[in-house]
Amino acid sequence: VPILVGRQTRVIVQGITGNQGSFHTRLMSEYGTRIVAGVTPGKGGTRVSGIPVFDTVASALEAGDADASVVFVPAAFAKEAAMEAIDSGLNPVVMITEGIPSRDAMVIMAYAKENDTTIVGPNTPGVITPGETKLGIMPGNAFSPGKVAVVSRSGTLTYEISASLTHEGIGQSTCLGIGGDPITGLDFVDVLKMLREDPHTDSVVLIGEIGGSAEEDAARYIRETRFPKPVAAYIAGRAAPPGKRMGHAGAIITGSEGTAATKIERLTEAGVRVAEVPSDLPRLTREQIPQLRQ
């Protein structure tokens, strides 16, 4: 079984009747994702792309079993939606929503931890197991099945880099966005711990960006635990000026912390091959894996 989701994963879409929810429900279904129900309060009894809609997660689960949730609920109501998913035992809960207040995010993460629930995001493009299932907004055609895991703070860079790996004949085991907000569920270290034991993954690509300390923490983990699989990385935002937010709420340099230079240095010290430009990653990945060198 892949690390988070696989072809057997049964999914509920929270916020299925909204523009994004309904659009991406159709694309996820077309990719092969097993969406068993949608939830939008007040819209119970309707259907979206043939999928039954319920007023609550609890009523959706009374009608049939589900494993995981993907959340397209607007930021103001996302906390409530996440709590409902956690209460119902859905795991993982993949939160696509951007702009969730930090205080709400802290409450969600604390509650998830108490309940042993894995949260992906918020402000994530989601998670995909290529050729099997995708939960989120990733364009399926960028990905192909294989043995390289891609873990990213950026959505669009995930697609670009995965597409370049695919183009070079290097498939992926799992690709996921940890989310661009300052407070997220899974971080790089959590995912590396999963990938360490994952028989489907031979090597890892980390896509980081300025701000915060997620990449430095990953570098420390890789170094101190002698992470057994090769890791390549790219850090976005080398040219970013201090104090300016670059796209994501979490992508901001404060003082000397969180600069691209620091992150690149820490990763390099940990034995990670850091790409100068995203298009270098297929080559670096190929050089690290004997089976790909032919």
What is the predicted function of each stretch?
Residues V1-Q294:
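Catalytic-core regions of core metabolic enzymes
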